[in-house]
């Protein structure tokens, strides 16, 4: 490796030390620093050989991070695709992530985090705002309705106590 390749390699390792990246992200970052396509290709091949760059690790870490933030798996996968993640690694990570994903529980947790005082949606405006919030997180209409209806029943039973 010449000096330019070593500098590009060091730059890529620094980026990977902060978080996992896919090859497309590293290509873009190295391209912004005006490294040639040949140098970038060499560095990415070396990173894969050395075990520093893994599309599977990126897909797993990215999906886990987005899902912990309350996103539905399909939306997290879509965002990973936009970043250039490898499709086969993404499909494997998505299959594993969906096994442990309980959409209804995540919806409830999101709403409780958003409104710790309780899930009060007795007026339609608040109910619609909560539904829109969950839809923007990638949840389907059936899950959203089920979550909001269950929480409405919980609120009514709490009010009766």
Where are these regions (language model features)?
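An alpha-helical, amphipathic repeat domain used for nucleic-acid recognition
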Residues: 1-161
